[in-house]
Amino acid sequence: MNIKLINIGFGNIVSANRIISIVSPESAPIKRIIQEARDRNMLIDATYGRRTRAVIIADSDHVILSAVQPETVAQRLTSKDDLEGEA
């Protein structure tokens, strides 16, 4: 089993195999998901005090906040897939 890791900013790395979705934090439903994760102690804040630009939802019900744009995280995710396919 290959473990693919994705850099989500500031040296923080998550397993690509565990990511369910990468979304913007602007909508009310996502804000509710963040608050519920905080209440359940399942929130991981990887923003280093910066503005949250991406919310990553993992298959373990963890919610990860990142200061990197969702498009950037998705691009890193797909570029890692492309590199693995060539090997």
Curated annotation (Swiss-Prot):
Domain of life: Bacteria
InterPro entries cross-referenced by the UniProt entry: RemA-like
PANTHER family (UniProt xref): REGULATORY PROTEIN SSL2874-RELATED (PTHR38449:SF1), REGULATORY PROTEIN TM_1690-RELATED (PTHR38449)
Annotated family: Belongs to the RemA family.
Matches recorded under HAMAP family: RemA
Protein name: Putative regulatory protein BH2513
Species of provenance: Halalkalibacterium halodurans (strain ATCC BAA-125 / DSM 18197 / FERM 7344 / JCM 9153 / C-125) (Bacillus halodurans)
